[in-house]
Amino acid sequence: MIFQKKRKTAETELSIILADDKRTSEINTGVGFLNHMLTLFTFHSGLSIIIEANGDTEVDDHHVTEDIGIVLGQLLLDMIRERKSFQRYGVSYIPMDETLSRAVVDISGRPYLSFNATLSKEKVGTFDSELVEEFFRALIINARLTTHIDLLRGGNTHHEIEAIFKSFARALKMALSENDNDNIPSSKGVIE
């Protein structure tokens, strides 16, 4: 399945394609560190992403990072609504050398993010560490997921953020995988 959205505001202009196939991802956010994290996300989630983004990065990376999270969340919601079968729940622990991150995902239709991660430094290169939570909040709310992200052990800030992205990607992959009953895993029969 292939899903595409464009978003244009006074601050950003985005074109994003999300697919659950093996196409090559092409990520150009204008923010080097975010490109790196999203590349890792695609590898570990099994999803393909093509992003072309322009934003007011001369101000900072906030708007483009948050808007990419918004649009990716909307595309994930579109994908979830098209699927007739998925596991619903996913959990992943990822070590990255001295760091350890846990992500738990419920495709619930009830948007909630618990982000329990005190990152060691305020920046990785020029990227503000606080934007990691902003990205995930935008994605989770728009995808209507219940998600808990916990940084259990820290150290190097790059490693901390990388472990967070990888653990979320792996938990999402598990939650999106087909279930044995070929149905929506809810006693209500629907997830909205």
Curated annotation (Swiss-Prot):
GO terms for biological process: L-histidine biosynthetic process. GO terms for cellular component: cytoplasm. It is found in: Cytoplasm. SUPFAM superfamilies: Ribosomal protein S5 domain 2-like. It comes from the Bacteria. It holds the Pfam family IGPD. Disulfide bonds: none annotated. Keywords: Amino-acid biosynthesis, Cytoplasm, Histidine biosynthesis, Lyase. The keyword rRNA-binding does not apply. Its EC number is 4.2.1.19. It is an enzyme of class 4 (lyase). One of its GO terms (molecular function) is imidazoleglycerol-phosphate dehydratase activity. It catalyses: D-erythro-1-(imidazol-4-yl)glycerol 3-phosphate = 3-(imidazol-4-yl)-2-oxopropyl phosphate + H2O. Pathway: Amino-acid biosynthesis; L-histidine biosynthesis; L-histidine from 5-phospho-alpha-D-ribose 1-diphosphate: step 6/9. The keyword Lyase applies. Belongs to the imidazoleglycerol-phosphate dehydratase family. HAMAP family: HisB. This is Imidazoleglycerol-phosphate dehydratase. The lineage of its organism: Bacteria, Bacillati, Bacillota, Bacilli, Bacillales. The gene is hisB.
